[in-house]
Amino acid sequence: VGQRQPAAAGATGRAVLARRALDDAAIAAVHAGIRWKSAPDPQEFIAQVRAAAVKGWAIDNGQINHGISTVAAAIVDTGGAPRFVLSASMFSGRENAEGMDAIGAAMRQAADAIAQSAYAMEMAT
């Protein structure tokens, strides 16, 4: 609450970047512009964005805020462009890897359902 972050930071940023058609150099440039608490290596960040593109959701394990983990999924329009992001944050260590995967999958399902509902009229025309 009351905190401002770069749009590309954290799980929300990875989720949005994953839905955009960016090459590795563009993702690395975004990475360089973020003020990290614990910066991932640029290649690791690129790999995280690419993994988010496959899974449909992204995670940040305390790299923006120590002790806070976030899972996020982008809500996309009919053209696949990210318009909104659905996210959940928790204290790091609260969930194991399997729990985070389950939360991520649920976030992806919810984001897809919201997108389908929000853009249903666009899809019908």
Residues of each region from the PLM?
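Cysteine/selenocysteine-centered motifs that mediate thiol-based redox chemistry or coordinate metal-sulfur cofactors
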Residues: 27-35, 108-125
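Short, flexible helix/strand-to-coil boundary loops that buttress conserved ligand/catalytic motifs
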Residues: 20, 99, 118
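Short, flexible segments with low predicted structural confidence
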Residues: 23-24, 78-79, 122
